[in-house]
Amino acid sequence: MPKVSVIIPAYNRAHLIGRAIRSVLNQTYQDFELIVVDDGSTDNTEEVVRSFNDNKVIYIKHERNKGAPAARNTGIRAARGEYVAFQDSDDEWLPEKLGKQIKAFKTASTEVGLVYTGFWRIEGDKRTFVPSPNITPKEGAIHDALLKGNFVGTPNTLVKKECFEKAGMFDEKLPMLEDWELWIRISKCYCFKYIDEALAISYYNPGSLNKPRSLMEAQTLKLMLDKHFEDIKRNRGLLASYYRRIGHLLCLNGQIAQGRGYLKKAVMTYPIDVKSFLLALISLFGQRSYNKAIQGYKRIIRCC
């Protein structure tokens, strides 16, 4: 049995997936299987995967497109390894990524269920190291820190398979951010360990959040708030930040009345939060005024 199961979900990524697969096969640590879950692709993704002709590579295909969370869950169910790693079809690993994570697990407490590394975020000509040095704590019992935002990532993680048995798998009902939500659940049961070194590269398309995606994020945050409300409400400032983010995204997406309602909730929950107050005030002047004000005050967007 392989020690590690690496899972790559793919949907119409024939032009990119070769790079991701090569970066996995070129690891210095070689005790792994690579499970590629083709999520109903209509291009030649299968042809590219099979061209590697490597007995480590296992190809599974969904008859129809089900989304990345479902594809990853299919991979988890098929995994034979003690540990599970995730790679995205358009990203890549540095050669020592798996080896250093396995070494970290060997020296870690049995309470550690996930080891993650730093990674480079490439967006156009801009390269950023993630997670930010300002984020603390990065390891140990980090459940409260993760409730505030996702600094863990996905292609840079190595997870004990037992974590999925205890905390569950990816939530297929979430429109996006399903990795963050899973890490929140796992962090309630296990400690995390961090390697302060960039061992993966994630590529992002440059550009701002578009309207359909911003609405998806608002819907996702609503679901996450419902799911983890008991933990989030213990910190009134944190609860207000969820309300504020949801409200702001809804307002940006043309749902000014509903968005204003969430912004009012944010103000009522944590009255000393200036950001919530300013956004709620701007929303009172209607959709056009809100859009113009936000375009004119980029700082507000960055704070939300």
Residue spans for each PLM region:
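Glycine-rich, basic loop-to-helix element that forms the pyrophosphate-binding segment
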Residues: 62-79, 100
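Short aromatic/hydrophobic "clamp" motif used to bind/position activated sugar donors
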Residues: 84
